[in-house]
Structure formats: C-alpha cells, structure tokens
Amino acid sequence: VASSAVVASREVFRLFLIKPSHYDDDGYVIQWVQSEIPSNTMAVLNGLALDCIERKVLGDNVDIEIIAQDETNTRIRPKNIIRAIGEGGSKGLVALVGVQSNQFPRAMDIARPLRAAGVQVCIGGFHVSGCMSMLPELPADIREAQDIGISIFAGEAEGRLDEVLKDAYNSELKPVYNYMPDLPGMEGVPTPVLATPNIKRNIGNRTSFDSGRGCPFQCSFCTIINVQGRKSRYRTADDIERVLRENLDQGVTNFFITDDNFARNRNWEAIFDRIIKFREENNADIKLIIQVDTLCHNIPNFIEKAGRAGVNRVFIGLENINPD
C-alpha cells in the first residue's frame, strides 16, 4: 500500500520596516528621488530580521518576508501594505522604526489607516524611548497611539526582536515593550545591513552603521544619554570588518558611521586600523562619513588614521560656544 504524506502549506509573515519622513512647513512630506543620509535604525533592524529568518524564529513552516522602506526616498502607500499583508491569508507587522519627535506626526498618519484595517503596528525610536525615559507620564501623542492599538517599543532591539515577531505572528502584540532599563551589548550581534535596492536609493550608494552607543558624560543639553544610556557600548573591530565584508559583497563601499562622536569611541583606533587593513587587502575604495568634536585633532594619530581609513567627510559638533 502506498503511503501518502501530507505536506503542510507554508505560511508567509510580512515584516514592513518603515522609516517615516516628516512634514515641511506647508504640510508636505519631505521626500527625495535619492536621499543623503541612510537610516541606521532600518539597517540595524533589517540585519536583526535577517538573523531571525536564518534561525527560523517563527518555525520551520513560516517564511518571513522583509520589506524595508525609507520614506525620505520611497512613497509609502498604506493601501498597498494592507493588501500585501492580507494577501493569501498571510500575516504581518508594520514596524515604524527610528521615529524621532518631528517624525511622530507622520508616523501616526501612516499608522491610522493601517490600524483601521486591522494591521498590527509597532512604533519605536527616539521619541517613544526618550519620552518613556525622561517624562513622568506619557505625552498625548503616544497615548493616542496606544488608544488605537499601536504597540510601543522603547529601547533597542538586539535580542528582543524575536519576542515581538512571535507576538505579532500570534496576534498578541503587547501594548508596550519597554527595554530602556536593560540596554543590550553590541559585541557579536547581527550586523546592520540593507539590501542593494534600498542602498541605491541613497546618494552615492551609501549605507550606515553604528560602532558605539551611549556616553559616560552627563551634559545637561544632551538627549542621547537619556535614550542610549550613560554606559558606552561598542562593536569590536571584528564586528566592523563583518559589516564591511557583507556590504562589499554587494558592491557597497560608502558608509556613514552614525556615532554622535566617533572620536570618543574607545575602540576608534582598532576600528580604523582594521578598516585600513581591509582597504589594502581587498583593494576596496572605502569611503566614510564620521561625526566628531572640535578637539579630536588633539588625539594622537586620529586625523592621520582617519584619512588612511577613507574618511572624506566630517560633521563637527559645536556643543557650546563661549562668546569670550
């Protein structure tokens, strides 16, 4: 007697990673054919989501499909998202990522029609993380988001994305995921990476990564420490080489290092040395944008090694100007 096996049909879970833009003074969404600065948050979450796919966190029978869209260079059409998530009985989650305070109104305008159609939505980024960290009670805009069923994610997603995806797959998203008291380490975690079509929407085929987060200083005007903490956390030189190699494999050699002050990353020299070695061994024309303070030229070897590593643009922060 011939035996027959029942093969379970595969499920699809669609994960939309959307970086909202913001409105100009006339109420129009600011958008470009190609944008200048790529979203590091989207690259981080895309890398974490790829790791979730590799580890099959939703089970062997579920295919996770990632759709990453940066609204500064891509039109976001909620109707298309609603159609895609509902197609063929698939499930999904829309994650509005890296949302800053001036982007929160736009994030809400994207989210409202999605929630009205029953699509699961989660918002994370500096606005919700900073408000939960600094304010005694949530402001009205975040409360409104919760009222229409939007999940709030405060903190960083390393080691936490599994939980959110599993909850969304089971249609059991929590109202709040608050990881602010427990910020993760950065060593050995999945690297930030974007797919080639996303990178080509940035001028110069540029992508981004962060080599460190947090700061030990307690400047009164700084919001970074209220979100990323007062303990500095770093990627290793091995981590950075992995970022470079994964991107070089898809022809990308142009990077923005998003640390607010790369010169104060205690691993700066090891990172520059590794990038210099990588450039020479792979004949790779690595180009870097970094952010530093006005005193970085006093750090021995910093300027010389920055040049050899491929730094060709620098943002210099003027935190305080003494009129005298």
Predicted regions and their residues:
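Acidic, low-complexity intrinsically disordered segments
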Residues: 3-250
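Radical SAM [4Fe-4S] cluster-binding motif and immediate context
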Residues: 188-324
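Accessible peptide chain termini
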Residues: 1-3, 324
